[in-house]
UniProtKB/Swiss-Prot annotation:
Statement: the UniProt record of this protein carries the keyword ATP-binding: yes
Top-level taxonomy: Archaea, Methanobacteriati, Methanobacteriota, Stenosarchaea group, Methanomicrobia
Protein name listed in UniProt: GMP synthase [glutamine-hydrolyzing] subunit B
Subunit structure: Heterodimer composed of a glutamine amidotransferase subunit (A) and a GMP-binding subunit (B).
Binding site for ATP: S29, G30, G31, V32, D33, S34, S35
HAMAP family: GMP_synthase_B (MF_00345)
First-level EC class: ligase
Catalytic activity: XMP + L-glutamine + ATP + H2O = GMP + L-glutamate + AMP + diphosphate + 2 H(+)
EC number assigned by the record: 6.3.5.2
Pfam families xrefs: Asn_synthase, GMP_synt_C
Species in which this protein is naturally found: Methanosphaerula palustris (strain ATCC BAA-1556 / DSM 19958 / E1-9c)
Protein keywords: ATP-binding, GMP biosynthesis, Ligase, Nucleotide-binding, Purine biosynthesis
GO cellular component, one term: cytosol
InterPro entries: Asn_synthase, GMP_synth_C, GMP_synthase_B, GMPS_ATP_PPase_dom, Rossmann-like_a/b/a_fold
Function: Catalyzes the synthesis of GMP from XMP.
């Protein structure tokens, strides 16, 4: 349990003191972590904050428009770097290599924007579970293990580095952020890339973006999972009409958790699972099969890569 009032005071003071008169680039994704960072930084340094949203081409359906609507008042800069990210991932199948590539590209985009604004400090929404998983070798996070050496920023600030996800939500409430942001499901920094087993292609991204949207539509409002997602896990044989199809296999996953360190699979009623499978296979012609993942964390991680 975090003392939100004390934390906010300390975080605002820390950001103000460490940045001095420098301009600060804010990595704003629209999730609760980066949104809390933005609110803290806005209190601390006002117009010296340069909030930037990078469209990596690996975002959820409608995400960029949503970000523009929610955060346009913060002098938000939207950078479309989708081709840059997807081209860099071409031919890469190893999950750690994908994460490293996304992390490096992510930082390079911010370096470019910093040069335009004069910003020398990078602010990130890294939370405690991110650091534990990176330091423990479980998997790297795009804003921790993926950061390349020789970074051009003089400082990288992570004011949420010691908080768990539920504590970040408490701080969001204390800051008066909208409930939509407070209770936003976690979304991985590398985006849909970690929901695609193997090489990331534009076709696969389009498939899994739509499958994720369907999964969220069917589960979020009724069941309030801590996180739910769809992942592209391989190819399988199916039949549509009289035609034999070698199409994608989509795995649906929904879990409950307190802090992301452990998680239990959500017991979704069979009729709901059947509806999700029916919608995904009907609305995405290239999908041949849908399965539901009931593995807890541990031994599995919540995301697939």
């Amino acid at each position: 349990m975090v003392n939100t009032e004390r934390f906010i005071q300390q975080a605002v003071s820390e950001i103000r003191e460490l940045t001095a008169d420098a301009r600060v680039v804010m990595a704003l994704s629209g999730g609760v972590d980066s949104s809390v960072c933005a609110a803290l930084a806005a209190q601390a340094i006002g117009e010296r904050l340069e909030p930037i949203y990078v469209d990596t081409g690996l975002m959820r359906k409608g995400e960029t428009d949503r970000i523009r609507h929610l955060f346009g008042h913060l002098n938000l800069r939207i950078v479309d770097a989708s081709d840059e990210f997807l081209d860099a991932l071409a031919g890469v199948a190893d999950p750690e290599t994908k994460r490293k590539i996304i992390g490096e590209r992510f930082i390079r985009v911010f370096e470019r924007e910093a040069e335009k604004t004069g910003a020398t400090v990078l602010l990130q929404g890294t939370i405690y579970p991110d650091r534990i998983e990176s330091e423990g070798g479980i998997k790297s996070h795009h804003n921790v293990g993926g950061m390349p050496l020789g970074i051009a920023f003089t400082q990288v600030l992570e004011p949420l580095r010691d908080l768990y996800k539920d504590e970040v939500r408490e701080v969001a409430g204390a800051l008066g952020l909208p409930r939509e942001i407070q209770h936003r499901m976690p979304f991985p920094g590398p985006g849909l890339a970690v929901r695609i087993i193997g090489e990331v292609t534009r076709e696969k991204v389009a498939v899994i973006r739509e499958a994720n949207a369907i999964t969220e539509e069917e589960l979020v409002e009724e069941f309030r999972p801590w996180q739910c997602l769809a992942a592209l896990v391989g190819l399988g044989t199916g039949v549509k009409g009289d035609i034999r199809l070698h199409g994608w296999i989509v795995a649906v996953r929904a879990v409950n958790s307190r802090d992301g360190m452990t998680a239990d699979p959500l017991e979704v009623p069979y009729p709901v699972l059947f509806k999700i499978a029916s919608r995904i296979t009907a609305e995405i012609p290239s999908v041949a099969r849908v399965v539901y993942d009931v593995t807890p964390k541990p031994p599995a991680t919540i995301e697939y890569e």
